[in-house]
């Protein structure tokens, strides 16, 4: 499972992909109705595909994006699906040039009925990455190039800022391939790059972002030494004027996603550097105190990763509730299995 969204205690969606009996990746979309998670039929394109992000604007207005493998053209193409309350239908996304693949990775609501997606394009699937941004205006998707599209970079997180704008985060690559945090802001008219702190001598990237207010935005990712070992969480905060680094508990691993807790704090979820260990969660309360929160128990010897997290509005009278999704990697041997965990949610499906 790669993405999750919730509108309330009886309306949540999780998306991802699975390998079918023929060894082909096909999309997965499951809905939680307050009692249990149930699979929906979501066709791929040309018999394949995967979904990386989902956004629910209403019970009959849900978007999911990802990519599908166009084998004859030797490129991956962007994929968008829309749920109308009864079924998923495909909606065309902008086409990329020959041999240039496109991967939308995150979704967020814009002004009015707009929906935005950000991600990356790449030549021959992996070379010369460039950030992408698509906007749905109620009738069609169109490309709105991010700032700095001449640089090798990608965008993997997106959030509405509460004032009609958007924050997109990811990574920009230097001449030697070293990563540095990338943050871009949409002000309603154009994208602009906003400087983000970077630790010299370390490769750093942002993966997820959430905005509690225009002057209270959180971004999470990874900070690693040149050899790639010893990865530690990277957490940045925007106060309306500048991005600053936040000190968090020392964990060997990285957060992939972040969301508000509904009480002035935030949750960040991710994976540990040792893939045989459980996923991890970090919580910051409204007073600024961070703590490490263990996930639910998994099977012995089974590692797990969280890739996305969302708050469930009104889910628990005792406090905010969350859904986190990801996958397991039993004993480091495929196949991966989906993980869906609830925090502060009692009853079936938790």
Question: Model-derived features: where do they sit?
Answer:
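Residue-level hotspots at or immediately adjacent to binding/recognition sites across diverse folds
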Residues: 1-350
């Amino acid at each position: 499972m790669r993405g999750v969204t919730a509108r309330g205690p009886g309306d949540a969606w999780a998306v991802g992909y699975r390998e079918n009996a023929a060894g082909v990746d096909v999309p997965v979309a499951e809905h939680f109705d307050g009692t249990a998670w149930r699979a929906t039929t979501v066709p791929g394109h040309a018999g394949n595909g995967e979904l990386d992000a989902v956004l629910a604007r209403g019970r009959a207005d849900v978007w999911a994006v990802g990519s599908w493998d166009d084998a004859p053209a030797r490129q991956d193409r962007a994929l968008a699906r829309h749920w109308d309350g009864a079924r998923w239908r495909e909606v065309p996304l902008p086409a990329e040039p020959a041999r240039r693949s496109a991967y939308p990775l995150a979704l967020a609501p814009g002004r009015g009925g707009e929906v935005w997606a950000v991600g990356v394009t790449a030549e021959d699937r992996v070379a010369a990455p460039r950030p992408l941004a698509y906007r749905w205006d109620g009738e069609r998707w169109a490309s709105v190039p991010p700032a700095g599209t001449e640089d090798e970079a990608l965008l993997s997180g997106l959030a509405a800022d509460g004032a009609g704008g958007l924050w997109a985060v990811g990574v920009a690559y230097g001449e030697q391939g070293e990563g540095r945090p990338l943050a871009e802001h949409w002000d309603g008219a154009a994208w602009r790059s906003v400087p983000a702190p970077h630790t010299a001598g370390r490769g750093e990237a942002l993966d997820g972002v959430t905005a509690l207010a225009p002057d209270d935005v959180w971004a999470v990712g990874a900070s690693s030494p040149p050899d790639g070992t010893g990865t530690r969480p990277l957490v940045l905060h925007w106060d309306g004027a500048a991005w600053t680094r936040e000190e968090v508990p020392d964990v060997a691993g990285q957060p992939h996603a972040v969301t508000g807790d509904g009480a002035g704090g935030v949750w960040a979820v991710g994976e540990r550097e040792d893939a045989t260990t459980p996923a991890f969660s970090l919580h910051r309360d409204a007073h600024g105190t961070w703590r490490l929160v263990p996930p639910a128990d998994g099977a012995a010897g089974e590692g797990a990763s969280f890739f996305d997290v969302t708050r469930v509005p009104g889910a628990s009278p005792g406090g905010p509730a969350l859904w986190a999704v990801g996958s397991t990697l039993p004993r480091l041997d495929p196949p991966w299995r989906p993980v869906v965990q609830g925090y502060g949610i009692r009853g079936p499906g938790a």
